[in-house]
Regions:
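Bacterial Sec-dependent N-terminal signal peptides
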Residues: 1-30
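Accessory beta-strand-rich segments of carbohydrate-active enzymes
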Residues: 33-35, 45, 75-76, 80-187, ...
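Extended substrate-binding grooves/exosites of carbohydrate-active enzymes
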Residues: 43, 61-73, 118, 153, ...
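Solvent-exposed, conformationally flexible loop/turn segments
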Residues: 82, 141-143, 205, 248-252, ...
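Beta-strand-rich binding/interaction modules
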Residues: 113-115, 204-246, 253-256, 638-661, ...
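Extended acidic/polar, glycine-enriched regions
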Residues: 138-141, 211-306
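Surface beta-strand/loop "capping" patches
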Residues: 182-217, 607-647, 709-718
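Compositionally biased, intrinsically disordered or flexible polar/acidic segments
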Residues: 711-733
Length: 733
């Protein structure tokens, strides 16, 4: 159950307690709460920690979400190992007659759970949830000891190699849930046991398919009634479905119901994300007491991918304007609050994105809920990256993680594709040079890909499958290119090698060779460091200006090439990658926003390109507030000042003097500005024609300090001149 849905139930309890007293059996007996507070934590191994009587008073007191890897922002060899979490649970007396479940939204990479010294179970996978029935292990007469052992060093669980930090810990919520003996199947791969799809969708009509499982944990049979209420986006009831169920003691009962057609459905799209709500109510047939209760949103939409015409949504061509997103933030790592996840989604939507690659792993439910509500199409994947190892249990863990991801997030209408491999030949080809060594690894990789493709289609035939390849034709040569429905290409021409025009050459070549293959540019990007600026930016200098140049080249190609379904920029944020030793060690700084989520200049370039509904005007290289240049005599020094905008023309002023107007090209305008004194005031304005009768002025301003460097240095002018030299780089620092 989503966090928001639980909050709604809780609010209902507070607002109308009188109704509960009058009709105590009518309200749902499904109780759920987080247990994020009052934990004890120990980093390392402790053999006795699972014991109910173990004294953990010397351990650190923490609250969830939590990670032990804040060291990854400073240490290349960050801690990868084990940790223990413990806390005491006192369970309500009235839970004695119920089934009690423990859910971990995520613990990286592996977790083993103990209650009162007894092992409940374990979970392999650091990015998907797991749920355990803990009823047989609980005490209702005395406090319970809960201990969780977490390990982020396991080599049989994906990922084992990647360009991001494998943060360890219980970094999402932990939940306790109590339900009557008859309830929805809560241990179904960490899902809620209810799956909703829209098998028939058009502008004229649509149907909703609701399927799932009910568990009877009592010994005796039960007569039940299952009701599904479909609510329109405006909250009115569209339809109701009821069925009677006879379920034996200990039985798991499967149900499947399709609604009659809903006429002229409100379609879900990024511009208008209309959501229908499906309320599922399980009752005792005789007493009408509500036993279990669930709410899920769904949306009517259909889509297609085509190798020639690209992507279509609801029958119309639609360009996927996307972003990839990692989930950490310096200095707290991946221990983000729900509101932090929501904030990121709002920032993306504000920029004009309509698509997110949730990479390289499943992320928090709060993020998926925002995708549905804000209108953000989504690609979600499991983290099989770089290489497939010959490790016992690895393939099984990959399969389980894929099933978990699909079942846990199946009901989100925003999701259009599931993925399961990223750049899987990158490390493979580097590590194995000899044919006899490479061949078995390729066979193992192909075998796993085919296995996962089969699982994906069994789990969900309504969405498409995808893999992301690095810029090498070897994927097609070994047969990986023919397995999934669509292919994503991670392309960095002009950054890691080659020149910028290699980007369009590669895409053209792939399209000629495989014209029927739908294609997404699943990664592209260039790093930037706010301390580095350049008048002659070039690849891998990490200057703010080269990131601008790079993206100004890539984005028009993505927008204007019809057979490209779209692209997802790598990455939305500057994220933790502990192995990196670049201008900002331990950070991959390709983000459109900094780690603290303050926007970079290129954020506004995208906003200007993607938001045609609002005016955008932004003076670029905004972090470059102290500039310098070589001055001949007393003549002003001309330096470029760039403005990002979606308005037709821009007028620029320096210290109140107009430098004229210039036409906008590729959402940019660049002026040569005469700098001469220590401090200048730069002011940009543009007319925004709101209607034939209404024109408003859009403005932006920036103070720039300028240091002139005399063309001829001598004893006199050197006395008051601080001359800094950035050795090995042409960047200003």
């Amino acid at each position: 159950m989503s966090k928001e849905k639980k909050y709604r139930i809780g609010t209902y309890l507070i607002l109308i307690p009188a109704i509960l007293f009058l009709f105590p059996k009518v309200y749902a007996q499904h109780e759920s709460k987080t247990i994020n507070d009052s934990w004890k934590f120990y980093q390392g191994e402790c053999k006795a920690a699972a014991s109910a009587t173990y004294d953990d008073s010397a351990w650190n007191s923490i609250h969830l979400p939590h990670t032990w890897n804040t060291d990854a922002y400073t240490e290349k060899k960050y801690y990868q190992g084990t940790g223990w979490y413990r806390r005491t649970l006192t369970l309500p007396k009235n839970w004695q007659t119920k089934q009690v479940f423990l859910k971990l939204d995520a613990a990286s990479k592996a977790a083993a759970i103990y209650m009162n010294g007894r092992k409940i179970g374990e979970h392999n996978g650091g990015y998907t949830a797991c749920t355990f029935d803990i009823t047989p292990f609980c005490s209702f007469d005395a406090p319970n000891s809960l201990a969780i052992h977490v390990d982020n060093a396991r080599q049989d669980i994906p990922p084992i190699s990647a360009d991001f930090t494998f943060f360890g810990g219980i970094y999402r919520d932990v939940w306790l849930t109590a339900v009557p003996k008859q309830h929805f199947h809560l241990t179904n791969y960490g899902s809620e046991g209810i799956f909703i799809s829209t098998p028939q969708v058009s502008e004229e009509k649509g149907t909703i398919l609701i399927r799932g499982e009910i568990k009877n944990d009592a010994e005796q049979k039960a007569s039940l009634e299952l009701e599904h209420i479909i609510y329109n986006p405006d909250g009115s009831i569209a339809q109701t479905q009821k069925q009677s169920i006879q379920i034996k003691g200990g039985e798991l009962y499967s149900f499947r119901t399709e609604t009659s057609p809903i006429l002229s459905p409100r379609l879900w799209a990024p511009e208008a994300p209309h959501l229908y709500r499906v309320e599922s109510i399980l009752r005792d047939k005789k007493t009408k007491a509500i036993l279990d209760h669930s709410n899920h949103h769904t949306g009517f939409r259909w889509f297609s991918f085509d190798g020639k015409t690209g992507f279509s949504l609801n029958g119309k061509p639609y360009k996927l304007r996307g972003i990839c997103r990692h989930q950490d933030q310096k200095p707290i790592g991946v221990a983000l609050t729900d509101e932090m996840h929501r904030r990121d989604m709002k920032l993306m939507k504000e920029m004009g994105a309509n698509f997110i690659r949730i990479s390289h792993y499943p992320q928090d439910d709060a993020l998926l809920e925002m995708c549905d509500k804000l209108g953000m199409l989504a690609w979600e994947e499991i983290p099989i990256i770089d290489i497939v190892p010959d490790t016992p249990g690895y393939a099984e863990n990959c399969e389980n993680n894929l099933r978990e991801m699909i079942r846990q997030h199946y009901n989100h209408p925003s999701i259009i594709t599931w993925g399961y491999m990223n750049e899987i030949l990158l490390v493979t080809q580097r590590r194995y040079k000899k044919e006899e060594e490479l061949k078995p690894v390729l066979e193992r990789t192909l075998s796993l890909a085919n296995r996962l493709e089969k699982v994906l289609k069994e789990e969900d035939s309504t969405r498409v499958s995808t893999m992301a390849f690095h810029g090498s034709n070897s994927y097609n040569e070994v047969g990986l290119g023919n397995i999934t429905d669509i292919v994503g290409w991670n392309l960095y021409q002009g950054w890691y090698g080659g020149d910028l025009t290699g980007f369009e050459r590669f895409l053209t070549e792939q399209h000629k060779k495989h014209p029927s293959h739908p294609m997404i540019v699943s990664e592209y990007g260039a790093g930037s460091d706010k301390r580095l600026h350049s008048l002659q930016p070039h690849a891998f200098d990490f200057s703010i200006e080269y990131q601008q140049k790079y993206l100004e080249h890539y984005l028009p190609i993505l927008e204007e090439t019809p057979y490209i379904c779209g692209g997802t920029h790598w990455n939305f944020i500057d994220f933790s990658s502990a192995l990196r030793d670049e201008s900002m060690p331990r950070i991959n700084n390709k983000g459109l926003v900094y780690s603290d989520r303050s926007p970079k200049d290129v954020y506004y370039y995208y906003k200007a390109a993607w938001r045609q509904d609002i005016p955008v005007l932004h003076i670029a290289s905004r972090d470059w507030t102290h500039r310098s240049g070589v001055q001949h005599g007393k003549a002003p020094v001309p330096l470029p000042v760039k403005v990002y905008t979606n308005l037709p023309e821009v007028e620029l002023f320096i210290d109140g003097k107009s430098l004229g107007k210039q036409k906008t090209e590729n959402y940019t305008v660049t002026f040569q500005v005469p700098f001469s004194r220590k401090k200048h005031f730069i002011f940009a304005q543009a007319e925004n024609k709101e209607s034939d009768q209404s024109i408003s002025m859009i403005e932006d301003a920036l103070h720039i300090n300028f240091t002139p460097i005399p063309a001829n240095l001598n004893e006199t002018n050197l006395r008051n001149l601080e001359l800094a030299v950035n050795v090995g780089s042409n960047c200003f620092y």
